[in-house]
Curated annotation (Swiss-Prot):
Homodimer. It comes from the Bacteria. It comes from Chlorobium limicola (strain DSM 245 / NBRC 103803 / 6330). GO terms for molecular function: DNA binding. It is found in: Cytoplasm, Nucleoid. InterPro entries: YbaB-like_sf, YbaB/EbfC. Belongs to the YbaB/EbfC family. SUPFAM superfamilies: YbaB-like. GO terms for cellular component: bacterial nucleoid; cytosol. This is Nucleoid-associated protein Clim_0875. Keywords: Cytoplasm, DNA-binding.
Length: 111
């Protein structure tokens, strides 16, 4: 067996970097949704786990503690959905060659 061709290895590394940049761009465009309290609180987050929107049913605004609990639950729900979408995109890009959880940790998006 001969040594691997350094030029081929560099091309593969460059391709992998380009794929990961594509994934980063895709994550910017993805939106995940979460809700709690039967839809009384709804949130949307990006694939990069940034909060995009928050909607609270005005009828529950007089119960601050409940609103706080529902917001936390809805945001966590949306963040979990966002992480799942990110893993899916990374898996597609990597073609099974890398562990998506490792990539998400490196991007500060994993648990």
């Amino acid at each position: 067996m001969g040594m691997p061709n350094l030029g081929d290895m560099m091309k593969q590394i460059q391709k992998a970097g380009e794929k990961m940049q594509d994934v980063q761009n895709q994550l910017e465009k993805l939106v995940a949704h979460g809700e709690s309290g039967g839809g009384m609180v709804k949130v949307s987050v990006s694939g990069k786990q940034k909060l995009l929107s928050l909607r609270i049913d005005p009828e529950i605004m007089d119960d601050a503690e409940m609103v706080q609990d529902l917001v936390i639950a809805a945001v966590n729900n949306a963040l979990d959905a966002s992480a799942a979408l990110a893993q899916e995109e990374i898996s597609k890009a990597a073609g099974g060659m890398i562990n998506p959880a490792d990539i998400l940790k490196n991007m500060n998006l994993g648990k």
